[in-house]
């Protein structure tokens, strides 16, 4: 999988706009308003904010339900709190540090436009599997969006390790998940099947990168697209429901 952005940060992304999902099986696999995101992808944070703003701009946003699905860009990634994203990107992408700084500066500027403050110097390398366990638990407490926001915030803006138990429990508490429940899920490798199912569904509908947003089971937006793409696609999906 890859991260999807827009504009200058092209090496980090792939994109296709307003895709119509035609495959019947694939459509059955997608719930209304499902968003596939990786917890440690900057474009997912930007895309989340763009989607929220697009929903706010709608004249009638009553009844819109958001559901977050899991997608791991690198499932085998080893957590290393001592390595920051800059050195990790340079090593894995084969970029010079100058290229890496240029790339992350573009992403930081994109984030600024949405009111987000990326801090790639502080962001540590972390496996996100445990954060996805919590994301599935959050569904039961109707606080997926709050948890997702919290995970993005502590990871990208505060440089916290999102594979760390304390950090995850703090995020869970902030979102409204009881500590005992959160701890149990993290201790027992909960929601393994659900995470695998999300990944399977992603493959079924041909998701190449994240974020990938699906509206009303048939319209897809790949990447942190321009606002008008979100506006147009949301409106299109809503018009068909009415």
What are these regions, as identified by a protein language model?
Residues 1, 26, 87, 108, ...:
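Short glycine-/small-residue-rich flexible loop motifs, especially phosphate/cofactor-binding loops
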Residues 1-42:
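Cofactor-cradling patches in redox/metallo enzymes
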Residues 20, 24, 28, 46, ...:
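A non-catalytic, amphipathic alpha-helix used as a structural packing/dimerization or gating element
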Residues 2-8, 112-113, 176-178:
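Short, basic/glycine-rich phosphate-binding loops at helix/coil junctions
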């Amino acid at each position: 999988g890859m991260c999807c952005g827009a504009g200058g940060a092209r090496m980090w992304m792939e994109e296709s706009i307003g895709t119509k999902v035609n495959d019947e099986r694939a459509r059955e696999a997608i719930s209304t308003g499902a968003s596939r995101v990786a917890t440690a992808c900057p474009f997912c944070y930007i895309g989340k904010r763009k989607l929220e703003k697009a929903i706010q701009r709608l004249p009638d946003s009553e009844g819109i339900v958001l559901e977050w699905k899991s997608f791991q860009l690198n499932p085998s990634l080893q957590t290393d709190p001592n390595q920051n994203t800059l050195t990790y990107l340079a090593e894995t992408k084969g970029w010079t540090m100058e290229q890496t700084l240029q790339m992350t500066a573009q992403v930081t500027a994109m984030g600024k436009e949405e009111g987000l403050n990326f801090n790639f110097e502080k962001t540590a390398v972390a496996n996100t599997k445990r954060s996805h366990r919590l994301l599935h638990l959050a569904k039961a407490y109707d606080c997926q969006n709050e948890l997702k926001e919290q995970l993005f915030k502590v990871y990208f803006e505060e440089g916290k390790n999102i594979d760390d138990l304390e950090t995850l429990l703090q995020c869970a508490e902030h979102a409204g998940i009881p500590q005992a429940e959160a701890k149990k899920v993290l201790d027992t490798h909960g929601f393994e099947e659900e995470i695998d199912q999300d990944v399977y569904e992603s493959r079924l509908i041909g998701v190449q990168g994240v974020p990938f947003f699906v509206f009303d089971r048939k319209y897809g937006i790949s990447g942190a697209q321009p606002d008008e793409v979100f506006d147009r696609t949301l409106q299109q999906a809503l018009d068909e429901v009415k």
